[in-house]
């Protein structure tokens, strides 16, 4: 069994434990806007920025709005949207039909009891969904992996593993991203011989790196600026973001670590009190259309989650993973991270950053 399969099966064992449709009117003078609502309204909670723009461009406009659905985006950061879902838990009718979340956050909302199981029978395109992206409580939209990133000129070589990245000998040539604390803790644990639920070896290693002079950047963007300025030469980041940085002229390369690459999945969940669940299934089905998946690969550098999407070989070489690397993708232990997140964040802030 691969690391990827073991992670998925383990997380699923933990999971097991634990219409306002408007009638069309062929009447002269009926506004186009009214006719466009003939299938009803779909409200999706999502991040803003490029992701929201590309949802409109690649999914909503060509595959939903053009077919009579009205789509409204409720844009906010995922902490705010998750808080809203929890606050609306007791309401018979919520305010959104879908929410875009990471795989970890999808699990957390499942654990909180605020989302429905996915009815895959109502999603025809799910037949092409990669098994690893078919969660009981959510559907994977796009994925990438937490790879080693480096500037060979600054570093004086190329890493092959997380162990090579989190080597105290790099001193201040190692860059760490503050908001990526969860994935950094797990990657460091793998580097130090720990596991996705044994992070203590990684915490010890990170303290050694800090003592040696590792730089901590507050955000992904600040990390990118540090790379651009050649302030440091090695770290970890999503491969998709690396492609975006390369496109922007930042001198950075990436490699899949030998321990197995930590997977990042962005997907959709359906709140239990979603007002229009038929719209929820329609949106997810459109999201899995090959055309939409292919455009997200081009526009954002993320990998498709369906097997019938076609990505050009040159693009796939930049954003994708080999069959062996896909087989070795490693999931966070969602139950462990949910249970220990508060303590891990406190350690990160007080011990590593303090």
Q: What are the roles of these predicted feature ranges?
A:
Residues 1-11, 21-23, 35:
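N-terminal secretory signal peptides
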Residues 27-33:
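C-terminal segment of classical bacterial N-terminal signal peptides
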Residues 36, 271-329:
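Mature extracytoplasmic/periplasmic domains
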Residues 38-102:
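Early extracytoplasmic/lumenal segment of secretory-pathway proteins
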Residues 49-56, 79, 94-231:
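Extracytoplasmic ligand-binding site segments that recognize negatively charged/polar headgroups
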Residues 106-110, 233-251:
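A ligand-binding cleft/hinge motif common to bilobed small-molecule-binding domains
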Residues 143-144, 204-209, 246-272:
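Periplasmic-binding protein-like
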Residues 325-354:
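Conserved C-terminal helix/tail region of periplasmic/extracytoplasmic solute-binding proteins
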């Amino acid at each position: 069994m691969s690391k990827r399969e073991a992670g998925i099966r383990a997380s699923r064992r933990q999971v097991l434990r634990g219409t306002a449709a408007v009638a069309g009117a062929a009447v002269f003078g009926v506004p186009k806007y009214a006719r466009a609502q003939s299938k009803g309204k779909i409200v999706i909670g999502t991040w803003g920025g490029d992701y929201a723009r590309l949802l409109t461009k690649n999914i909503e406009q060509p595959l939903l709005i053009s077919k009579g659905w009205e789509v409204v985006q409720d844009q906010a950061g995922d902490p705010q949207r998750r808080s809203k879902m929890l606050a609306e838990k007791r309401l018979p009718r919520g305010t959104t039909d879908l929410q875009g979340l990471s795989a970890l956050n999808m699990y957390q909302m499942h654990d909180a009891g605020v989302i429905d199981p996915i009815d895959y029978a109502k999603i025809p395109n799910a037949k092409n969904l990669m098994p690893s992206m078919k969660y009981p409580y959510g559907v994977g939209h796009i994925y990438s992996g937490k790879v080693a990133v480096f500037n060979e000129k600054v570093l004086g070589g190329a890493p092959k593993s997380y162990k090579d990245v989190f080597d105290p000998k790099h001193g201040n040539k190692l860059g760490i991203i503050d908001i990526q604390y969860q994935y950094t803790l797990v990657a460091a644990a793998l580097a130090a011989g720990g596991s996705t639920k044994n992070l203590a070896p990684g915490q010890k290693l990170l303290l050694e790196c800090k003592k040696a002079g590792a730089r901590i950047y507050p955000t992904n963007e600040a990390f990118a600026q540090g790379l651009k300025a050649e302030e440091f030469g090695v770290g970890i980041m999503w491969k998709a973001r690396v492609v975006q940085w390369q496109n922007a002229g930042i001198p950075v390369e990436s490699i899949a670590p030998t321990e197995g690459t930590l997977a990042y999945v962005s997907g959709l969940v359906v709140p239990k009190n979603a007002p229009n669940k038929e719209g929820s299934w329609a949106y997810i089905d459109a999201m899995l259309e090959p055309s939409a998946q292919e455009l997200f690969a081009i526009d954002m550098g993320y990998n498709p989650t369906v097997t019938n999407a076609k990505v050009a070989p040159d693009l796939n070489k930049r954003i994708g993973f080999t069959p062996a690397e896909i087989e070795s993708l490693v999931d966070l232990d969602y139950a462990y991270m949910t249970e220990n997140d508060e303590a891990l964040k406190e350690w990160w802030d007080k011990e590593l950053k303090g």
